[in-house]
A protein has these predicted regions:
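Pyridoxal 5′-phosphate
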Residues: 1-172
Length: 172
């Protein structure tokens, strides 16, 4: 699961105020110092990891990895999980609503291992058809990579339905 709202969405006032306070009075590198502020920042960072782990029902806090953004996260998944778990006969499904950060890593993986990329079409409003998705997914599909809310088209994709179908077919 990857969650990202930092790239192009508005921030709640309390988030802006909290960040302002941190930058003005508490900022220090995480896990990079032995001084008080660094220890406090590191503790808050790990506290956030624990809260996310609990929210997502992760077995261990260490299952939660923070990255700088979407591009880094998708590249990490493609170059680690993708490279280890996909082969020449496997498929990746994406949609036409995707940002380049969710296209190029899969294209690079395809060049490296020979897997296939299938693209779910979108209608004139930028929505995907569940029927079209179901026609494209198969037991060869190992990864379904799509945005929940497209910052390219502004559409909301049916994440629960797509995830259920993906899991039913053995894909992540």
């Amino acid at each position: 699961v990857y969650l990202d709202s930092a790239g192009s969405s508005q921030k709640p006032t309390q988030v802006i105020e909290s960040l302002k306070r941190v930058y003005e009075t508490e900022y220090s590198n995480v896990h990079r110092g032995l001084h008080y502020m660094s220890e406090q920042t590191s503790a808050r960072y790990e506290e956030a990891r624990s809260k996310v782990a609990k929210f997502l029902n992760a077995e261990f806090d260490q299952e939660i990895i923070f990255t700088k953004g979407t591009t880094e996260s998708i590249n990490l998944v493609a170059s680690s999980f993708g490279r280890k778990n996909l082969g020449p006969n496997d498929e990746i499904l994406i949609t036409w609503a995707e940002h380049h950060s969710n296209i190029i890593p899969w294209q690079l993986l395809r060049e490296q291992i020979g897997c296939e990329i299938k693209v779910v079409p979108v209608d004139d409003d930028g929505a995907i058809s569940i029927e079209a998705f179901e026609k494209l997914i198969s037991k060869k599909t190992k990864i379904v990579a799509f945005c929940h809310v497209s910052n390219v088209l502004g559409t909301v994709l049916p994440v629960k339905e797509v995830a259920k179908i993906a899991h039913r077919n053995g894909a992540v």
